[in-house]
Amino acid sequence: AHLVGIGGVSMSPLAEVLHGAGMVITGSDMRESPAVEHLRSLGIPVAVGHRAENLGDAELVIRTAAVHDGNPEIAAAHDKGIPVFERAQAWGAIMRGYQHALCISGTHGKTTTTSMCTHIIMAAGLDPTVMIGGTLPLLGAGHRVGKGDTIILESCEYCNSFLSFFPTIAVILNIEADHLDFFKDLEDVERSFRRFADLVPEGGRVIANRDDANTMATLAGETRPVTTFGLEEGDIHAAGLRWDKGLPSFDVIYQREVYAHVSLK
């Protein structure tokens, strides 16, 4: 596979995951960068500048939404009949290789929540593959390639990217009228999130914020199992919330019993 814009924040982790899975990867980017140097250190050839000859013998091409059809490498791929996929489609294909795919969505809080889930799942020894839209100190990066059967992805609604995913657990933190350069209005955003929830297969689950009215309205009538969470209401909620030096701690209540005590640090 050849990745156009391979040095990007969302493309370099993709290259690492595909490389780790044994796929032959090449790429190109407009400039040198630490990400490009890192990929080269892994044995992935990266060309600087976009030229048709960079495709080599690639059997498929992956690009970000920012790379348009006028790009010489994309144009050459179309001319040669080489299939071209968006980055989100590639992540979706990767997810199918995992038994558990935890996809965390929402207008706000995605990076923080994905990071916290990564801490928890790694502490449980599950060795997940992770893609986060920011740098997590625990990882020293925004991604990791694991060998377990779990993948955790920050899942963005912009351009309906998350509709290319295959979540077994779809988390919706909140929904607001955002990215209105793409969506028409709040209702259009809500339709996208409903379609995201509907991607969950039999045996999967939707996790939703009980405190967010738009999220609950969006999921009204949802046929997939929905588990809600909230500060005071929800299937899972907090009790005994207190603050110590600006940091919260609380009991997690599940099925009317204390499931765990949480202290954020």
Enumerate the language-model features and the residues they cover.
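Short polybasic amphipathic segments
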Residues: 248-254
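Short amphipathic alpha-helix with an adjacent loop that forms part of the alpha/beta core around
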Residues: 50-57
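Short acidic/polar mixed-charge low-complexity motifs
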Residues: 149, 232-234, 256-260
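Short coil/loop residues immediately preceding or within conserved phosphate-binding loops
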Residues: 99-101, 247, 259
